[in-house]
Amino acid sequence: MRLALVSLLVLGLMAPVSAPAQECNWQAGWVKAENAKAGNKNWDSDVVMRFSADFTRRKEAKRVEGYFDQASIGCGQSASLKILGAKSADISLYRIGYYKGTGARLITTIKNAKQITATQSTPPGQYLVKLKSLGYRSTFVPLVITGQVPSNVTFVSSVLTWQAYNQWGGESLYKGADGQRETRAISVSLNRPYDGDGSGQFRYMEQPLVQLMEQLNLDINYLTDIDLDKTPEINSASIVLGGHSEYWTQAMRDVIEKEIYEGTNLLVFGGNTAYAKTYLIDRTMNERIPYRDINQPESLFMGSQFFAVGIKKDLEVQAAQSWPFDTLGKAGKIKGIYGYEADTAMGTKGPGVEVLARSTISPTEKGFVAMSTYYAAPSGAGVLNLGTNAWVCAMANRCPWGHSFDAKTVQQIRKVTTAIIEQAGREKIGNWRVPQIDIPTRP
């Protein structure tokens, strides 16, 4: 095992670029106003979506690729762009949102780009930056522009998890260039593009959720998990995580636990969340240690934890008359939504939880079942873990394991998600919706 180092053709400086002083002012309601603007239909049609860790695609054609020297920037800050595979590239900066169903808005284009600076003209949000160079296939580069303003929800993009699985250059924390686990890297650099289409896991594990939240016209702040590692103040009713947020530093976890203690809701629309402890030193991720191996299982603050991989199970609603599954009416089942990875509260440590839903189980099966759990912290914060990493990708029927979902299932997921976000974006849901404990506290 070794550090995943790649010889790169780099343009631009490695150090953050200073920018002239900027003032950005985002008033309440800015997300609604932003999404009233015209979007760009077919904005992503020339970049075929490819799942991360699909390193074989690199044999197909020449591509222009790149990465920023920072995962996120705030007002007045700049991120330097590194171009690989071509001598230069033009970029199109797309902000992801609803935009009357188009999904993104073109903010600006830059010829022969070297950097991006956040200003009043670049609203906070999740961006996909399209690279174009004559004779090369285009790819995306993700970038978050933070707002740090009062908001209904703060969405956290899980870039550390993307990098753990990122096979660009030949090695990830899971396998080496020969595809074998024995040759995997023990550390990986963030100074490299993402494999697949360049967007990491964003287009399937986060984008469908981001677009739905923006459609609801709630005010949203955007961060990455690297921002959480720097222990920021969260000024939102709820923190939202997408479909796959597996890798957490200790500082990240400390921030989340502090926010729950102080009354901020935690909404987890994924599975296998906060499973692995990692260390971030400058722009390098180091090691992978399951938190449960150091007596800090993720269930201590989430109420449930990862237990199964490679499954596909139906979700059976246990509290059909109560929020949030009451939005489904008499329909008490969502087909095939538990998996590929799933969580449970059985056999874990942590606070007492209500089981909102659980997986179906056949008479021949024994042991634990997948669960969606909910509990209220003493602060009044609600912690809801849907416990499956298919939840977000199923919204757009674009899951990476060969799982597909019919139109009814997609609508069910969107209804429940809408109910969760709208309510939890307003208040401490632990006070509003008192959980009915099914599994008591497990010391």
Locations of the language-model features?
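Secretory targeting and sorting signals
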Residues: 1-20
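Proline/serine/threonine-rich low-complexity linkers at boundaries of modular beta-sandwich domains
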Residues: 26-63
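Aromatic-Pro/Gly-enriched surface loop or interdomain linker
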Residues: 84-99, 126, 135-233, 431-436
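Helical hinge/lid and interdomain linker segments adjacent to catalytic or ligand-binding clefts
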Residues: 106-109, 115-121, 198-280, 411, ...
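Extracellular low-complexity, Gly/Ser/Thr-rich intrinsically disordered linkers
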Residues: 213-215, 348-443
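An acidic, glycine-rich "communication" segment
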Residues: 274-367
